[in-house]
Every structure is written in C-alpha cells, then in structure tokens.
Amino acid sequence: MFARGLKRKCVGHEEDVEGALAGLKTVSSYSLQRQSLLDMSLVKLQLCHMLVEPNLCRSVLIANTVRQIQEEMTQDGTWRTVAPQAAERAPLDRLVSTEILCRAAWGQEGAHPAPGLGDGHTQGPVSDLCPVTSAQAPRHLQSSAWEMDGPRENRGSFHKSLDQIFETLETKNPSCMEELFSDVDSPYYDLDTVLTGMMGGARPGPCEGLEGLAPATPGPSSSCKSDLGELDHVVEILVET
C-alpha cells in the first residue's frame, strides 16, 4: 500500500498534467473563436460598406471589435503570423480600413470617431475600392434609366403612329372625302323625302298606307346594307393607313 504523501504527490502531478492540457485546449479554442470572430467581423464590415445607406452605429461597433481583437493578437504575438493568412484568404481590396469606412459617415453626421479607433490600425488600399463602387453605381443608374425609358419609348412610338394617321387624313383632299361619303348620305336623303311626303300629304287610310310602304321599304334597306358595307371597307382602309 502506498504512503499517504507519495499518493498525494502522484495525484497532484496528474492534476497538473490535466490542468495543463485543459489550459492548452482552452487557449486553442479561444484562439479559434477569436480568429472566427475576426473573420466574421471583417466580412460584416465589408457588407456594411457595400450598402447604399450604411448604419453608422453598426459599423462603429464592428470596427471596435476588430480593433480589440487586433490589440490582443499583437500582444500575444500571433497577429504577424495570422495577418498573411488572412491576406491570402481575402483579397486586399476587401480588407479596408475601419477609419476609411467610417470617415464619410462621420463627415456627414458631424460626429467624432469612437475612442477605440486609433491611428495605429491597419489601412487598406482606398484606390482599389473606389473604382469598384464607382463602377457599380453607374451600372445601377443606367439599368434604372433603361427601365424607366422603356415605356416612354413605347408611348412615343404610339403617339408617332397616331400623328401619322392624322397627317394622312389632313393631307387628303376634302373633295375625295366627300366622294367617299356621298354614297353613304344618299339613302338617308331618300328616306327623309319619303317621310316628308307621307307627313305632308293627305291622311291616307290604313290599306293605302300599307300599300305605299310595302314597295318603298325594300329599296332603302338593301341600299343601307350595301352602304354600310362600303363604310366598313373605308374605315378598314383608313385604319390600315
């Protein structure tokens, strides 16, 4: 049976080993969590900058988070080893400085930068980012302008076709128009003369009225049908022109 003191030493040694292993695990897990948080913060910062109207409070909070992680990694000495890997993962034009991202918003709102943002943070190339945003904006404006001009062009073509139709109607000689509609007006005049003759004459009997109307009705009805057919034909010609 082991002595009491020796047993305690063995247990203490095992506990120290387990504690060291647990500490290494916690340190490695914390470094992984910190690296993942840094990556997510950089992505969110980029997305905030790409918005048309970025949220100032959100961008400042994300920038402060990136700044704190950078300070911790510089103190641990892991910033120099991780920075090239991050540069290989994402292009340089996406890792833009937090001060550059928030400078325009600070100038518009008249606010001062957060105390967590200093002058010693990393700076990304601004010249690489500006052409991208300036190239995206005109494309969006051109697409919206083309979408708005589409119905206007259709309206313009419709108005032009109407103007051409009215011009063709105005340029024609009025005598030609009278000749076209002369045949249409003739049966109405015949019907008027028949009605005026019936009203102006003596009041006939019932049999005489029927005899007088019987031979007169077939002629105007047939002529009206033919004239209406001609009128439809003329209207079709005018619509086609």
Swiss-Prot record:
It is found in: Nucleus. Induction: By E2F1. Its main location: nucleus. The keyword Nucleus applies. Residues 30-77 form the SERTA domain. InterPro entries: E2F-SERTA_domain_protein (IPR052262), SERTA_dom (IPR009263). Highest levels of expression in the pancreas, thymus, testis, spleen, liver, placenta and leukocytes. Relatively low levels in the lung, kidney, prostate, ovary, small intestine and colon. Hardly detectable, if at all, in the brain, skeletal muscle and heart. GO terms for cellular component: cytoplasm; cytosol; nucleoplasm; nucleus; plasma membrane. Coiled coil: none annotated. Keywords: Nucleus. It comes from the Eukaryota. The keyword Nucleus applies. One of its GO terms (molecular function) is transcription coactivator activity. PROSITE patterns: SERTA. May participate in the regulation of cell proliferation through the E2F/RB pathway. May be involved in molecular regulation of hematopoietic stem cells and progenitor cell lineage commitment and differentiation. PANTHER family: CELL DIVISION CYCLE ASSOCIATED PROTEIN 4/SERTA DOMAIN-CONTAINING PROTEIN 2 (PTHR16277), CELL DIVISION CYCLE-ASSOCIATED PROTEIN 4 (PTHR16277:SF6). This is Cell division cycle-associated protein 4. It comes from Homo sapiens. The gene is CDCA4.
